[in-house]
């Protein structure tokens, strides 16, 4: 299996390099047949090559957290955990973290690639095609970050929220849908999870998520029911429309508001995107910031 992956990575390295500035979930790119093949291959490969404790996962993630805390906070503050898309951290996420701090919340930006030594080029070749680090595995990063956040004296553990873009949105919804116990441990590679690792999660914001093959969205009930807002970009030609899957999830009892951003593309917040399918939309970005502030105010 490793030999097959190495051969494919070698043959696609130049293509991935040319796309090094493009945005998450490039599954709909120039080689859809290969992308589909390797997405399917991801289900045949072990989700996690080794098991580790929650504390060990935290030790790997923590050096790469970017934390922005509100100024003049007089006590524990609400928190927004931020999960990037499959292209990795982007400048607009830092801007969202600043907006969260200005609204009175601390922001924890999770970099899921740095501790795994996944470069941006490798991410486009493997994560964006589904061959590596699928949402159910990355859910372990959210579980570990929740555990870390609850232990911080500056965090109000009853007012934790999470926002995820694209692959990050997939991660959030799979994290809510995994079954406690053996399935959750096998999917995330974490050995000592609590019965409910998302305890204290009060709200989510799910932005242009991938909801297709390999996700649990619309196919399973959530274990807990945080207030949720889902943003669909009307002109999303990267992950396609997620409306049907999100509506199925809502029909299963998820308290989710589904918003369609007209004339917005995937990664509409990214001023520096080079992918022709992506267009920066300042009005949509401002609206997203408003929704973030509303979520924080309601915590």
Q: For each predicted feature, which ranges?
A:
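N-terminal secretory signal peptides that target proteins for export/translocation
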Residues: 1-28
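Bacterial N-terminal signal peptides
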Residues: 32-45
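Serine-hydrolase catalytic machinery in alpha/beta-hydrolase-like enzymes
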Residues: 54-69, 76-155, 170, 268-276
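Primarily recognizes the serine-hydrolase "nucleophile elbow" in alpha/beta-hydrolase
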Residues: 143-223
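Short beta-strand/loop motif that positions the catalytic acidic residue
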Residues: 230-232
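Acidic beta-to-alpha connecting loop that harbors the catalytic carboxylate
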Residues: 234-237, 263-265
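Conserved alpha/beta-hydrolase "acid-adjacent" motif
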Residues: 237-244
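C-terminal catalytic histidine-bearing segment of alpha/beta-hydrolase fold enzymes
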Residues: 255-299
């Amino acid at each position: 299996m490793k030999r097959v992956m190495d051969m494919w990575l070698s043959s696609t390295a130049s293509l991935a390099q040319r796309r090094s500035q493009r945005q998450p979930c490039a599954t709909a790119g120039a080689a859809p047949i290969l992308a589909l093949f390797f997405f399917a291959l991801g289900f045949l490969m072990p989700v996690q090559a080794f098991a580790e404790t929650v504390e060990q996962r935290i030790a790997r993630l923590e050096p790469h957290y970017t934390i922005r805390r509100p100024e003049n906070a007089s006590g524990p503050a609400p928190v927004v955990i931020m999960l990037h898309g499959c292209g990795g951290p982007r400048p607009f996420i830092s801007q969202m973290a600043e907006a969260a701090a200005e609204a009175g919340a601390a922001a924890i930006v999770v970099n899921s690639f740095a501790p795994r030594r996944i470069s941006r080029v490798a991410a486009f070749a493997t994560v964006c095609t589904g061959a590596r680090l699928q949402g159910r595995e990355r859910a372990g990063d959210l579980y570990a970050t929740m555990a870390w956040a609850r232990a911080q004296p500056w965090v109000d553990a009853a007012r934790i929220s999470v926002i995820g873009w694209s692959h990050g949105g997939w991660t959030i919804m799979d994290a809510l849908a995994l079954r406690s116990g053996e399935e959750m441990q096998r999917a995330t590679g974490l050995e000592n999870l609590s019965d409910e690792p998302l305890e204290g999660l009060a709200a989510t914001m799910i932005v242009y998520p991938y909801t297709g093959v390999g996700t649990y969205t619309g196919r399973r009930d959530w274990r807990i029911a945080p207030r949720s807002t889902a943003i669909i970009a009307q002109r999303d030609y990267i992950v396609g429309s997620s409306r049907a899957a999100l509506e199925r999830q809502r029909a299963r009892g998820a308290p989710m508001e589904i918003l369609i951003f007209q004339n917005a593309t995937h990664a509409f917040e990214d001023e520096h995107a080079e992918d022709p399918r992506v267009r920066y939309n300042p009005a949509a970005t401002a609206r997203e910031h408003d929704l973030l502030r509303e979520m924080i105010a309601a915590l």
